[in-house]
């Protein structure tokens, strides 16, 4: 059945429109809502719970279908109107109050969950419809993907990973060669420093030894000169101590 989205100023206008449509279809609509409502309110009270959550979720539809609905007794129509959310339009509030009349009577006699009208179903299903549209769009996009395209993409990704792995393997030897060359340069520099230090040490040692040898040689030369002088002096003294016989002998033989 198609529901009209035409806004009504009152419930009476909506009811008259509904009766016309039913009569045009050859049906006899039930118009005993007010009498049934009065009888039901006399027998028991009803208190309608409104949900103030967003997206116009007016009723809790998560109850099992077989559960019996019982309502508190002390509730008036003014209290019900006071609990209507302020963010609903005026014509929606009117339709909500009129809907509560029908639902009160139906619940009182049948004790079954009351089906919601089109506007309330739209309010309750607002968030779910958005989620379902997004889910369907994602599923359709996933289903429209060509298997060959997806296989090609997977192959390209795999090839890219392999190439990245090769590049990393090529970069490792470069780093290793660079590190080994740096280590070689460092070792070479250290060896040069060791050789230089050793040469300097040897030079110092050679200089010290040479200086020592010079001192020793000089000391030996001085001592030898002293000994020569001493010998000459001794010889001279011995020559002066010759006897007269030796001097005469020298004169007679040598002629001096």
UniProtKB/Swiss-Prot annotation:
Species the sequence originates in: Mus musculus (Mouse)
* Top-level lineage group: Eukaryota
Compositional bias annotation for Basic and acidic residues: 161-188, 218-227
- What keywords sit in the KW lines? Coiled coil
Where in this protein does the record put region Disordered? 62-84, 144-256
Q: Does the keyword Coiled coil apply?
A: yes
The entry's protein name is Lysine-rich coiled-coil protein 1
Which chain positions lie within coiled-coil regions? 209-247
Compositionally biased spans, kind Polar residues:
64-79
